[in-house]
A protein has these predicted regions:
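Active-site cofactor/cluster-binding pocket
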Residues: 1-188
Length: 188
């Protein structure tokens, strides 16, 4: 079983990202779950969401405490949360940032990828200049960095879960797939 933990802030789309990813994995023949964990349920508050998948039926229903991979939708989360808590060695950390992966020496035990999802979201009219919605963008980068899911399945998941601006969300995901910067081992 593979488990992914998303760290974001309310309004960025972490919960929908986990659902889109689960849908994409299901489309590729895997069993998948997606679920959130909320603290203070307000816009801008830290949020975690989770996706787990396997080739066989999943009976586990707990939160993800030892993720295989971590996705950080808001770089400022790194200042308030230990995103590597429980992260398995050699796991991927994907960070929404304009910085290169080498800017994160504290993550030397892990494989690191970065993408400027805020910029790509803004360029595609997703959210606002001060509150870009980066969930679909980050999933394009996740597909490329990890190799765990294909971009076509992500795009189909976007069609299913995103109520508006489907073309803009798909375009942003495709661009993120092309622009993600990967450091460490090649995709699994």
């Amino acid at each position: 079983m593979i488990e992914i933990r998303f760290h974001g802030r309310g309004g960025q789309g972490a919960v929908i990202a986990s659902k889109i990813l689960a849908s994409a994995l299901f489309r590729e023949g895997k069993h998948a779950q997606a679920f959130p964990a909320f603290g203070g349920e307000r816009r801008g508050a830290p949020v975690m969401a989770f996706t787990r998948f396997d080739k066989k039926t999943i009976t586990r229903r707990s939160m993800v405490y030892e993720p295989d991979h971590v996705v950080v939708l808001d770089e400022s989360i790194l200042e308030v949360a230990d995103v590597t808590s429980g992260l398995k060695e050699k796991g991927w950390i994907l960070v929404n940032t304009p910085k290169p992966p080498s800017a994160y020496p504290q993550f030397h035990k892990f494989r690191v990828a970065t993408v400027d999802a805020n910029r790509l979201a803004q360029e595609n009219g997703l959210g606002t200049a001060t509150a870009p919605v980066v969930n679909t963008v980050i999933l394009g980068a996740f597909a490329k960095a990890t190799g765990l899911v294909g971009l076509p399945a992500i795009l189909e998941g976007i069609e299913e879960y995103v109520p508006g601006k489907k073309e803009a969300n798909s375009a942003a995901a495709k661009t993120a797939f092309e622009q993600v910067i990967i450091f460490g081992s090649s995709p699994i």
